[in-house]
Amino acid sequence: MNFLSHYSSPLGPMTLTSDGEALTGAWFDEKNRFVSTLANDAVEQELPIFTETGRWLDVYFSGREPEFMPKISFGEAGAFRRAVWELLRAIPYGETVTYGALAKQLANPRMSAQAVGGAVGRNPISIIVPCHRVVGANGSLTGFGGGIQRKLALLKLEGIDTAKFSIPKKGTAL
C-alpha cells in the first residue's frame, strides 16, 4: 500500500509518499510528473516517516544542514538509477557537482553525462536526495523538476555562490 502526505515549504507545496516504512517520494506539487507513479490505492495518512521528513525539511528550509536523515526507499528502481541516486546522496550540503563528474564516479568509461542526467531527472525524492546540487559543466542550472528558480533558491539557501551559474534561455525543467 502507498501513502501520501503534504508539506508546506517556503518554495511551495510538496507531496510526500511512503510505502508505510520509508519515504519513497518528495516533490513540488505543480511539477508533479511523479503523480503517475502513485498507485490508485494511495491513502492520505499521517505516518511517522512523514513527521520525520517534515522535521528534516523544517531544519533544511531554516538554512541549516539536518543532522539526521529520514529512511528512504527507491522501490523498484533499476541498478543504474539507484547508483546515481546514491551518488546524489553523497554530495555535501553547500556544494555542487557536474553531471560529468558524477558519470566519472560511476567508474564506467562508457557512461555519459547525459545518461547520468536522465537518472538525476528521475529522482523521486527531491531535496533530500539532492539533485538540485548537480549543474552543467558550463555552469548551467539545467534539469531540476521543481523548476530552475527553485533550484537557484535551494542553492542560495545552502550558502552557494550562485553568481557563477547561468540560467538557460530555454531547455530542461524551466
Regions found by a protein language model. Give the residues of each.
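Basic nucleic-acid-binding alpha-helical/helix-turn surface characteristic of O6-alkylguanine DNA
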Residues: 1-111, 157-174
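Short glycine/serine-rich loop segments
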Residues: 111-153, 162
